Amino acid sequence: MTIVKTSNLGFPRIGLNREWKKALESYWKGQTDRETLLSTLDEQFLTAIKTQIDQQIDVVPSGDFTFYDHVLDTAVMFNWIPERFRSLKDPLDTYFAIARGTKDAVSSEMTKWFNTNYHYIVPEYEKSTEFKLTHNKPLEAYEKVKKAFGVETKPVVLGLYTFVSLSKGYEPNEVKEIQQRLIPLYTQLLKELEEAGVKWVQIDEPALVTASYEDVKAVKEIYQTITEAVPALNILLQTYFDSVDAYEELVTYPVEAIGLDFVHDQGRNLDQVKKHGFPKDKILAAGVIDGRNIWRSDLGERLTFVSEVIAGAQPKEVWLQPSSSLLHVPVAKHPSEQLEEKLLNGLSYATEKLAELTTLKEGLTKGAAAIEAAINEAEQALLTLKEFAKGTNADFTAERNNLSSKDFKRPVAFEERLRIQNESLELPLLPTTTIGSFPQSAEVRSARQKWRKNEWTNAEYDEFIKKETKRWIDIQEEIGLDVLVHGEFERTDMVEYFGEKLAGFAFTKFAWVQSYGSRCVKPPIIYGDVEFTAPMTVKETVYAQSLTEKKVKGMLTGPVTILNWSFPRTDISRKDIAFQIAFALRKEVEALEEAGIQVIQVDEPALREGLPLKESDWADYLNWAAESFRLSTSSVQNETQIHTHMCYSNFEDIVDTIEDLDADVITIEHSRSHGGFLDYLEKHPYLKGLGLGVYDIHSPRVPSVEEMSQIIDDALNVCPTDRFWVNPDCGLKTRQEPETIAALKNMVTAAEVARKKLAQHA
């Protein structure tokens, strides 16, 4: 009979009340000392461990906790310190500097962790890097837990293949050499764990799900070398986020357990297990509870499914796990949460998901009858949720059925629109603008809190927003920007704001998840049909436009980003959800245009992150993603200029889709890519309006005019000057006012310098 245990891959770091975030930001602002920071973070780490112990998880991970990012942890641990930071002597200062930058050094690039909403710091390989193990972070975490609770844990290590795959700075022909140089470091790290008495270590290799058969075979040789050095150490080789194509090769790796995702694999991992079997000498770590969404599990269905997995694999032992780290969901249901009970009962966060695993284990070991009450409770909660979410959305159904190609297409082609818009908008060469949001000061946040607590009336709050909007319109005019924004002071989050005004969304007060560093977000919950109910942005945008002769952009979040940054329902397709959102936004775009707004930005920063991991699955997603954007924007007049914005992406993969959006102008985060996208544009010109971010908004440093001028000059070598825009990387909500104004002044000056150069060479 198969032995059944429960295991976890990782737990949220931020704490139930975001204690982790608050400790970091307080330290960065100089409000607390290092001792307080370290003490608070230790407390959060141990609290997370205790939660997992309390939920009766048999194999608890340690080492997944971080002060900023687990990929950065790995880079620093192996001494991958970019040269521009090596003059810093203090390890903690260096660590934070790589992530956040300093006044003299640009931070390392940040990008999406596979196809999730989490961002990691991209490790930088440099030929001058001295490869060495500077400290053993997984061992430190293991010993800390053992001292505090006296329990064995499973240290988590980012795998060698994935670490190199996520890094930058090397040529393809250097990969093997870098891997070989890292093998002794990984061996040393694991040897120290073995010598400390560690029984199990989890090595995360999610990059194997997209690896070729040849790569999977080559990586096997790496693990043969490493594991031979640590014969007493049991290794779980963990994959997640999709299926493994080279399954037959993977299961021959010289490790004691293989971790597979049976939730986000489109059924392919189970098919492989049934077709090829599973090694009798290995443990199957089966990801059977969704680690990335927040819906309660149908325990009866899951019990049947797990039984099917076990029957197909017939392993000696199975570990029931989430499909991935629980980093991507909130910590637990907060006691002060104010959701409708019918909805709340249908949700499951990290802590509740662990309880589901424990219940499934009981059902497998004692029989379904032993958990009948839990199965019935879950079934009833999901039925109640379905009834709560019920709605026909007749308007959407009728519109959806009547769609034709003209609903996805602007009246005329881009070149003709460009001519019309140039005459209508009368903008200078290299127009300057921002991406949308301005700093939300303590005063802004305080005003919002007073309003939400009913300490302020709607009229009082509206008056405050108007005052702040006018102040920033004046600031923008003084700076000399060409196309202005209203600043988004009424918005907490670019998705939450729209979801609160659309039918079919629910919002929490405490369900925070980590986005990057200390940045946390509360993703909306799409539980029902999405519908437009009333104009959402017209009032604020029209007011801002009334204050200036310059054009003010309407600012909307696009349908794919709203979908990808939400916890979506799972009873209809993602395409159908995106189209529902697109119909709602289409009405908002039309309302803005009707109100006299000539420039409308529909942001799609999350378009690329929704890509399936396997390239063979891309075409369908990219097709409906572009369709949903065009459905949102194609009903406007030729004089109306449609902008979009994207960030944190490897755009080379989706340039055809960017073209397919048919936006008049796209602004792109660029400054942290260190010129990589320009190399691509040199070979593959983009001929519509384009703004490449000229400075990094994730860092408090103010870039010089010369620095931004260089980026503009480099861009103009490959971009048409008559359709190039100058802008920051992203919105400025999280920055402080003085640095924002200083940076924008330098940006406008850099644009003016570039215009003069162009005039001299005309």
Curated annotation (Swiss-Prot):
What are the recorded GO MF terms, alphabetically? 5-methyltetrahydropteroyltriglutamate-homocysteine S-methyltransferase activity; zinc ion binding
Name the catalytic site residues. H698 (proton donor)
Q: Which InterPro entries match?
A: Cbl-indep_Met_Synth_N (IPR013215), Cobalamin-indep_Met_synthase (IPR006276), Met_Synth_C/arc (IPR002629), UROD/MetE-like_sf (IPR038071)
Q: Which cofactor does it need?
A: Zn(2+)
Enumerate the residues binding 5-methyltetrahydropteroyltri-L-glutamate.
R18, E19, W20, K21, K112, R519, C520, W565, E609
EC top class, in one word? transferase
Q: What reaction does this catalyse? A: 5-methyltetrahydropteroyltri-L-glutamate + L-homocysteine = tetrahydropteroyltri-L-glutamate + L-methionine
* Keywords in alphabetical order: Amino-acid biosynthesis, Metal-binding, Methionine biosynthesis, Methyltransferase, Repeat, Transferase, Zinc
Q: Which GO terms describe its biological process?
A: methionine biosynthetic process; methylation
Q: Which amino acids does the record list as binding Zn(2+)? A: H645, C647, E669, C730
The pathway this protein participates in, as annotated, is: Amino-acid biosynthesis; L-methionine biosynthesis via de novo pathway; L-methionine from L-homocysteine (MetE route): step 1/1
Positions contributing to L-methionine binding: I435, G436, S437, E488, D603
EC code = 2.1.1.14
* Cofactor binding comment, as recorded: Binds 1 zinc ion per subunit.
Q: Which residues form a coiled coil?
A: none
Q: What does this protein do?
A: Catalyzes the transfer of a methyl group from 5-methyltetrahydrofolate to homocysteine resulting in methionine formation.
The text of the family note is: Belongs to the vitamin-B12 independent methionine synthase family.
- Tell me what this protein is called: 5-methyltetrahydropteroyltriglutamate--homocysteine methyltransferase
Please give the organism.
Answer: Bacillus pumilus (strain SAFR-032)
The coding gene here is: metE
